[in-house]
Amino acid sequence: NIPEILELKRKSLKSIAETTSNKIIISSSTSGFMPTELQKDMQFPERFIVGHPFNPVYLCPLVEIVGGKETSDNNKNIAKNFYESMGMHTLMVRKEVPGHIADRLQEAMWREILHALNDDIATTGELDESIVYGPGLRWSFMGMNQIYMIAGGKGGARHFIEQFGPALEWPWSHLKAP
């Protein structure tokens, strides 16, 4: 496990690339760096991917697979098959973006948690309970989009927004970083 220091990661990945067969896929679990940044000085950069898992990995099967500008589609698919052979659920991230997908969603919630703490709305324990015993249970089997499709009835998420959108304006305006 290499610390999240760009130059250290690049140097380590370059060394790994120089000492392994060009048929070996090299992966990093980073969520802080873009694959294109990391594959910059590597030999055969087409074999580099980010395979970003979630902890604890024995409970959270998601692995986000992100390729850089030089990563081949074939190598992304090989990585996908490898992770799936271990029982992981893969998500092919369409483009490089800081934090990939799931961490970005998690960070949006984290910002709201920091606001709630800062505004003395709840304690850390109360905030965790509000997730663990509330939407966290639902999120374990339904994604946010599916929830709002169902909540909107026959009209789906569009109807939900039309019906409840005005009441959501205040919370949406509060989601800026504290």
Where do the protein language model's features map onto the residues?
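A general alpha-helix detector
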Residues: 61-62, 109-113, 143-144, 160-163
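Conserved Rossmann-fold dehydrogenase catalytic segment
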Residues: 84-108, 122-128, 142-148
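Rossmann-fold dinucleotide-binding core
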Residues: 2, 25-95, 99-104
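Rossmann-like NAD(P)-binding element
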Residues: 1-25
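Short, well-structured alpha-helical segments that form the helix of a local strand-helix-strand
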Residues: 79, 123-134
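Interdomain hinge/lid region at the active-site interface
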Residues: 136-178
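C-terminal regulatory/interaction module of P-loop NTP-utilizing enzymes
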Residues: 115-123
